[in-house]
From Swiss-Prot, chain B:
Single GO biological process annotation from the record: protein localization to basolateral plasma membrane
Primary location group: membrane
Protein name: Ras-related protein Rab-10
One GO CC term on file: phagocytic vesicle membrane
PTMs per UniProt: Ubiquitinated upon Legionella pneumophila infection. Ubiquitination does not lead to proteasomal degradation. Phosphorylation of Thr-73 in the switch II region by LRRK2 prevents the association of dRAB regulatory proteins, including CHM, CHML and RAB GDP dissociation inhibitors GDI1 and GDI2. Phosphorylation of Thr-73 by LRRK2 is stimulated by RAB29 and RAB32. Phosphorylation by LRRK2 is required for localization to stressed lysosomes.
UniProt keyword terms in alphabetical order: Acetylation, Cell projection, Cytoplasm, Cytoplasmic vesicle, Cytoskeleton, Endoplasmic reticulum, Endosome, Golgi apparatus, GTP-binding, Hydrolase, Isopeptide bond, Lipoprotein, Lysosome, Membrane, Neurodegeneration, Nucleotide-binding, Phosphoprotein, Prenylation, Protein transport, Transport, Ubl conjugation
Gene this chain is encoded by: RAB10
Organism: Homo sapiens
GO molecular function: cadherin binding involved in cell-cell adhesion; G protein activity; GDP binding; GTP binding; myosin V binding
Domain text: Switch 1, switch 2 and the interswitch regions are characteristic of Rab GTPases and mediate the interactions with Rab downstream effectors. The switch regions undergo conformational changes upon nucleotide binding which drives interaction with specific sets of effector proteins, with most effectors only binding to GTP-bound Rab.
Chain positions recorded as GTP binding sites: 18-24, 35-36, 40-41, 67, 122-123, 125-126, 152-154
Subcellular location: Cytoplasmic vesicle membrane; Golgi apparatus membrane; Golgi apparatus, trans-Golgi network membrane; Endosome membrane
Catalyzed reaction equations: GTP + H2O = GDP + phosphate + H(+)
């Protein structure tokens, strides 16, 4: 009835204790000091008291009896205190264990990537402005943009030369570019006649001054 | 019948911290205009301006880089083809001045050894907000043996002078034998493989 509340792995020890009880009060003296209960201390005091009584009423025995009682009281206090402390710590441990499990479950549910490395970043997939493209893709796009820009500048320059009469029209032959002219025509079906003419001129001009154009192209940014 | 629209082609590069005004400096030079809205340059851009020096038509192909750290791997690959580099800081921004040594190190690491360098202290119209004295700019330029100008893209101070001086310095180093403009090889290399013309 005075047994301290034991659980789980301690149940075995409790059983052993019971066995000890079955072995009689003397069994308590054979127990490990770490498994002693106050019950055991009472058993021990019962055994010792019985033996002291058997020694008779010699005053030396009486004197010794006081000391033994004192020592047994100290043992009782220690065992009691120890068991209480163990029980308290056990409760505390179980409580913390439950709390950790709860937090862990909560954490994994909320953000599965809590354990990111120091050089990682989290991307919000619902953010319409989230990063999507790689540096290489940006590099490629920029290169293409700059290439097209430089080609446009070349074409504008050529056009300017043409407009200002530096290059006489119909110079040489643009026949080999006929296909491109057709393509240009098809792709600009909606544009008016004047625009078509400019495209035709441009293309034949590009062809005419091919070497010039190419030279500059090579000189252009890459 | 190739016509010649220029005698020489010089490739220049603008570098410096984000927001010091590299794009504005270039815009002032190429278009003689100024815009107060700040739009961070994405990676790299360029403009072309033809000038005449010592009777030669010189086409300046000026590369404008993004100052932001995140574009550095892209921008540094453009250093190598540059014949002249303008390093720009902002006289109202001490950090941009402190970073000059970092930019100079970048030049040492990525540009041609004989590249012509120039230091520009921009926004010199904002004297009330100045934190970098002109003398400090001059001093660091002297230490590195490079030219220095204080400029203002907004007030159009020293912009053309800076570009023309840099072009002259490059012209001075250019071999007397004038290269055929059609074959000027200024392909930047710079980690980016040159693309071949498909237009002809």
């Amino acid at each position: 009835m005075e047994e301290p509340p034991l659980r789980e792995e301690e149940e075995e020890e409790e059983d052993e204790g019971d066995e000890g009880d079955e072995a009689g009060p003397e069994g308590a003296l054979g127990k490990s000091p770490f498994q002693l209960t106050t019950e055991d201390v009472y058993d021990i005091s019962y055994v010792m008291g019985r033996e002291l009584m058997a020694l008779g009423s010699d005053p030396r025995v009486t004197q010794l009896q006081f000391k033994i009682v004192r020592v047994l009281e100290m043992l009782e206090t220690l065992v009691n205190e120890g068991n209480l402390t163990v029980e308290e710590l056990r409760m505390e441990r179980d409580h913390l264990r439950k709390e950790v499990e709860g937090l862990r479950r909560e954490g994994s549910a909320a953000s599965p990537e809590v354990n990111l490395g120091p050089d990682k970043m989290v991307i919000d997939l619902t953010d319409p402005n989230r990063p999507r493209f790689t540096l290489q893709e940006l590099r490629d796009v920029l290169q293409e943009r700059n290439k097209l820009k430089s080609q446009l500048l070349v074409v504008q320059e050529e056009l300017q030369c043409y407009k200002s009469g530096l290059i006489p029209p119909r110079e040489g032959s643009g026949r080999r570019r006929e296909k491109d002219v057709l393509v240009a025509r098809a792709s600009s079906a909606s544009s008016n006649k004047e625009e078509k003419t400019i495209i035709r001129k441009l293309i034949s001009e590009l062809h005419l001054h091919g070497s010039c154009c190419q030279g500059r192209e090579e000189g252009l940014p890459s | 019948m190739a016509k010649k629209t220029y005698d020489l082609l010089f490739k220049l590069l603008l570098i410096g911290d984000s927001g010091v005004g590299k794009t504005c400096v270039l815009f002032r030079f190429s278009d003689d205009a100024f815009n107060t809205t700040f739009i961070s340059t994405i990676g790299i851009d360029f403009k072309i301006k033809t000038v005449e020096l010592q009777g030669k038509k010189i086409k300046l192909q000026i590369w404008d880089t993004a100052g932001q750290e995140r574009f550095h791997t892209i921008t540094t690959s453009y250093y190598r083809g540059a014949m002249g580099i303008m390093l720009v800081y902002d006289i109202t921004n001490g950090k941009s001045f402190e970073n000059i040594s970092k930019w100079l190190r970048n030049i040492d690491e990525h540009a041609n050894e004989d590249v012509e360098r120039m230091l520009l202290g921009n926004k010199c119209d904002m004297d009330d907000k100045r934190v970098v004295p002109k003398g400090k700019g001059e001093q660091i330029a002297r230490e590195h043996g490079i030219r220095f100008f204080e400029t203002s893209a907004k007030a159009n101070i020293n912009i053309e002078k800076a570009f023309l001086t840099l072009a002259e310095d490059i012209l001075r180093k250019t071999p007397v034998k004038e290269p055929n403009s059609e074959n000027v090889d200024i392909s930047s290399g710079g980690g980016v493989t040159g693309w071949k013309s498909k237009c002809c």
